[in-house]
Amino acid sequence: MKILLSGAGGFVGRQAAMELAAAGHQVLTTDRSGAVDLPGDLSDEQFCRGLPDVDAVVHGAAVQYVSADLPLGARRAYFQRNNVEATRLLCRRYAGAPTHFIYIGTSMMYAQDGSMLYTVRSPMAGQGIYSRSKLAALRFVRQLPNPHATVLPCIIGGPGREGLFRPFVAMAKRGTVAYPGEGRNPISMVHVADVASLIRHVVASRAKGLFNAAAADALCIEQWIDLIQAQLGMRRVRRLRIPLAPVRGLSWLTGYRLLAREQLLMLARPHVLAIEESLALGWRPLYDSARIVRDTADFLHKPSHHPVDPGVRRQNT
């Protein structure tokens, strides 16, 4: 199968490219930068028009709060151009063609309302600029006459991931870990290899609908810290809980560079995904949450043991 993979220079994109190629597919990669087949900007109409005919599109390209080129101002326009307009143009390019369209979303698109479990039937709501842009993009995908599917990963871990894990590992090395909130709400996570595997299953079955990507279990932040402490071989790590209110204020002042608004909601409430629809495709997550935390902590503690292509920008989606 001939597949166009957007966002191929990113954390998930690199893994998905390897997974799909190993399954025997011809993978054409595209991104704004990095070692890809078709470098270009999907928000450029001319570039999108020139994209080749393919059997499937896996659309993983997106920007978020921690993107390297996030501007200090005009952020709404930035997310609109890179997430919404890019998706609109990509959908227009392949609308009506015999092309299966797979959109990579985020579990932040669910309305974080305190539910103990988020299923593919749970309501969605944009609760920050990022999730609003991803939902706006999803509307174009849902308007396609083509068969289409959406993969919704939760927090993604594994070698190469940084995000919230980097400060936790750095603080643990110093003997004290400070974290916002109580740290006792279960939060789903998923290994990047399992996300790529789910994408492969969706492509292979030409599946339609929504598919959550998460490990079979969920841990809380306190448990993450226990695992990081053990992985680093630390005898004692002090915990320091920070009330969420001042963290929310600081995040707002930094334009949610410190923590995304959606992440703040996740810290205050459970965020656990149901994966029945994904399991029905024959997909099985190979990594439990403890293994994901350990692998990510090990990468951050000993990065030389897990080389990352230096020509590729690290991303956090």
Show where each model-derived region lies.
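NAD(P)H-binding glycine-rich loop region in Rossmannoid oxidoreductase-like domains
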Residues: 41-84, 93
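Mid/C-terminal beta-alpha module of Rossmann-like enzyme folds, strongest
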Residues: 201-261, 290, 294-297, 303-317
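Substrate-positioning beta->alpha
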Residues: 132, 161-167, 181-203, 209-212
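Glycine-rich NAD(P)-binding loop of the Rossmann-fold in SDR/ketoreductase-type enzymes
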Residues: 78-89, 128, 132-133, 190
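Conserved Rossmann-fold NAD(P)-dependent oxidoreductase catalytic core, especially the SDR/UDP-sugar
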Residues: 85-129, 149
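Conserved beta-loop-beta element that borders a ligand/cofactor-binding pocket
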Residues: 106, 138-159
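Conserved C-terminal active-site "lid" loop/helix of NAD(P)H-dependent oxidoreductases
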Residues: 192, 226, 250-285
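N-terminal Rossmann NAD(P)H-binding glycine-rich loop of SDR-like oxidoreductase domains
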Residues: 3-23
